[in-house]
Amino acid sequence: MYDVVVVGAGPAGSMAAKTAAEQGLKVLLVEKRQEIGTPVRCAEGISRESIEKFFEVDKKWIAAEVTGAKIYAPNKTEIVMSEEMAGNEVGYVLERKIFDRHVARLAAKAGAEVYVKTAMVDFERKDGKVKVKLRRLGEDWEVETKILIGADGVESKIGRKAGIIKTLKLNEVESCAQYLMTGLDIDESYTYFYLGRELAPGGYAWIFPKGNGSANVGIGVLPKMAERTAKEYLDAFIEKEGIEGKIVEFVAGAVPVYGEIETAVADNIMLAGDAAYHADPITGGGIANALSAGYYAGKVAAEAVQKNDFSADFLRRYDELWKNDFGKKLRRNKKLQLKFIDMDDALLNKLAGAIAGKNLREMSVAAIVKELLKAHPKLLWDLKDLF
């Protein structure tokens, strides 16, 4: 009998397993893939604050350090933002293959059992416990646990069966494609974001430096607005921008841009990370929120074991923690995202022109909003309930 079984060894799952094990719980962490951290399905960016509040930074899993972001409007108007203003995805670019394994190793060091090539086939709640059916190398076996934590990604089998989440609609998920490229000639102290409805309908393109002339070059599009695949939009972006380099890796995937879900718990069950749609609806970034959610899930699991109460009512303490941390931001950024996808390229150019050339490092958010409102007064009405 385990206290906690965690499914999925990404940042959320490994963090949950590590935190629960550190509280003295008997923990099992399973990952269906052969290697933790592969394939990489994100741009790998995270702010310094988001990573340093949980870990002592190890240069082995830092691919690059960036000091700001450059954002390009469709007409190439450039906006330069400081690291502090650029959000949760700017500061470090991680080497996710190494970082994810590092967090899983910390979970094991804390006492968690970690199995790779192990998939969750099914689960059943019975008599206040959860029976979890696992499959490894073609063999099935069952384990019993008091708490099941689903960190099994955007299409969470656990979340759907528990009735916590439903299948996402085409306007609630971004389709993403990304190349790892080498031989690039870029200033590696910045991350780069490219906007435009023609370029990336409902999303944006990005370049995240990884050092030594390499970078993640990717794009995210909203399937409801897109007329082609994400990869086709990515290839068109690279050709249009004249990006010359060698493609050494390709990944594709989906990122939830749902916003804040009502609850991430059911009896005996908690969801964390992409499984709970914790990714930022504007940026699609999810590492920072996943780490925080995993930490909160592990802490609440320990409290539940101590109280011997695994009901949804008790586990809603987890909802309170993640909602108080980043729930408001998810709600706000979902509303901003809905406004953003309505903007045509002409309006994006106009807004960018209103703040381009200004020293944003010395401007408050309120001052920037004021400049944007001068360029587009209707924004004041559209966004009145966000600030």
Swiss-Prot record:
Entry's Gene Ontology cellular component terms: cytoplasm; membrane
Pathway recorded for this protein: Membrane lipid metabolism; glycerophospholipid metabolism
GO MF term list: FAD binding; geranylgeranyl reductase activity; oxidoreductase activity, acting on the CH-CH group of donors, NAD or NADP as acceptor
Reaction(s) this enzyme catalyzes, per UniProt: a 2,3-bis-O-phytanyl-sn-glycerol 1-phospholipid + 8 A = a 2,3-bis-O-(geranylgeranyl)-sn-glycerol 1-phospholipid + 8 AH2; 2,3-bis-O-(phytanyl)-sn-glycerol 1-phosphate + 8 A = 2,3-bis-O-(geranylgeranyl)-sn-glycerol 1-phosphate + 8 AH2; CDP-2,3-bis-O-(geranylgeranyl)-sn-glycerol + 8 AH2 = CDP-2,3-bis-O-(phytanyl)-sn-glycerol + 8 A; archaetidylserine + 8 AH2 = 2,3-bis-O-phytanyl-sn-glycero-3-phospho-L-serine + 8 A
Annotated EC: 1.3.-.-
Residues that hold FAD according to the record: A12, E31, C42, A43, G45, R96, D274, G286, I287
Alphabetized HAMAP family for the sequence: DGGGPL_reductase
Family recorded in the similarity comment: Belongs to the geranylgeranyl reductase family. DGGGPL reductase subfamily.
Record-given protein name: Digeranylgeranylglycerophospholipid reductase
Origin organism lineage: Archaea, Methanobacteriati, Methanobacteriota, Archaeoglobi, Archaeoglobales
